């Protein structure tokens, strides 16, 4: 594991940069089962749709459960829902749009709020069938069930455009623990992070802190003994 320079180590941003270095040696669920992991996609459109569906399912749900639900959708959506000439299997806009909400719900029944997400997924597919996949934030957040956090990740992973910092519970928790921000909600955290974090760090900060929050800086009983900044973190148990 490398180390940050002396100048970089100063202040909360320096603590984050050291976490970034430690993350290079950590494989977390977000690295192997996050929204950017899109196996078996045959086209760019299908890859982008996979990312959007994964993000929709991910709220209040662990990456492992979301990943399993995605696999079930790819495997279990009925072939009768495919259009003429469409390859068999896979997760496509047409297959979802042509599927019953009940069948979609059965595929994703282990994710949080699956009833609502099944209905939203069906509606999204119907919208995308008419309008195509979105490329702008305003179009993304107009879709049912898609908020700022998901839209920012979609823009980054599906469109290769980083327009902001996506903040979830891990990013919010760790940013406050290390003193990078002093905020009470994720939207305030997003605004403050975009103010204090250099733009060159925006693309990766979500993955870095989510993975760190899944493995080391967990919500309850954080593993401070394994943390590279345990002697300097203001929230350290050491």
From Swiss-Prot:
Name of the gene encoding the protein in the UniProt record: NTH1
Site (Important for catalytic activity): 168
Alphabetized GO MF terms: 4 iron, 4 sulfur cluster binding; class I DNA-(apurinic or apyrimidinic site) endonuclease activity; DNA binding; metal ion binding; oxidized pyrimidine nucleobase lesion DNA N-glycosylase activity
EC number: 3.2.2.-, 4.2.99.18
Binding positions for [4Fe-4S] cluster per the UniProt entry: 217, 224, 227, 233
Catalytic activity: 2'-deoxyribonucleotide-(2'-deoxyribose 5'-phosphate)-2'-deoxyribonucleotide-DNA = a 3'-end 2'-deoxyribonucleotide-(2,3-dehydro-2,3-deoxyribose 5'-phosphate)-DNA + a 5'-end 5'-phospho-2'-deoxyribonucleoside-DNA + H(+)
Protein name: Endonuclease III homolog
Pfam family of the protein (one): HhH-GPD
Cofactor(s), by name: [4Fe-4S] cluster
Protein task: Bifunctional DNA N-glycosylase with associated apurinic/apyrimidinic (AP) lyase function that catalyzes the first step in base excision repair (BER), the primary repair pathway for the repair of oxidative DNA damage. The DNA N-glycosylase activity releases the damaged DNA base from DNA by cleaving the N-glycosidic bond, leaving an AP site. The AP lyase activity cleaves the phosphodiester bond 3' to the AP site by a beta-elimination. Primarily recognizes and repairs oxidative base damage of pyrimidines.
GO biological processes: base-excision repair, AP site formation; nucleotide-excision repair
Similarity section: Belongs to the Nth/MutY family.
Matches recorded under Gene3D superfamilies: Helix-hairpin-Helix base-excision DNA repair enzymes (C-terminal), Hypothetical protein, domain 2
Domain (HhH): residue spans on this chain: 129-155
GO CC terms: mitochondrion; nucleus
Species in which this protein is naturally found: Encephalitozoon cuniculi (strain GB-M1)
């Amino acid at each position: 594991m490398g180390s940050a320079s002396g100048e970089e180590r100063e202040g909360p941003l320096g603590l984050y940069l050291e976490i970034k270095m430690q993350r290079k040696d950590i494989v977390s669920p977000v690295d192997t089962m996050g929204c950017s992991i899109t196996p078996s996609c045959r086209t760019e459109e299908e890859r982008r749709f996979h990312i959007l569906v994964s993000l929709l399912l991910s709220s209040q749900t662990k990456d492992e459960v979301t990943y399993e639900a995605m696999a079930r959708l790819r495997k279990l959506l009925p072939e009768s829902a495919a259009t003429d000439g469409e390859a068999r299997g896979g997760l496509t806009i047409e297959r979802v749009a042509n599927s019953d909400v009940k069948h979609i719900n059965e595929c994703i029944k282990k994710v949080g709020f699956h009833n609502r997400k099944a209905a939203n997924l069906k509606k999204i597919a119907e919208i995308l069938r008419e309008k195509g996949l979105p490329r702008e934030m305003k179009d993304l957040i107009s879709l049912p069930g898609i908020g700022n956090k998901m839209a920012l990740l979609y823009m980054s992973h599906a469109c290769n455009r980083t327009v902001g910092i996506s903040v979830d519970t891990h990013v919010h928790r760790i940013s406050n623990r290390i003193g990078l921000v002093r905020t009470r909600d994720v939207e305030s955290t997003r605004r403050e992070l975009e103010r204090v974090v250099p733009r060159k760090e925006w693309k990766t900060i979500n993955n870095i802190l989510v993975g760190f929050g899944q493995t080391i800086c967990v919500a309850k009983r954080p593993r401070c003994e394994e943390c590279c900044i345990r002697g300097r973190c203001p929230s350290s148990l050491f």
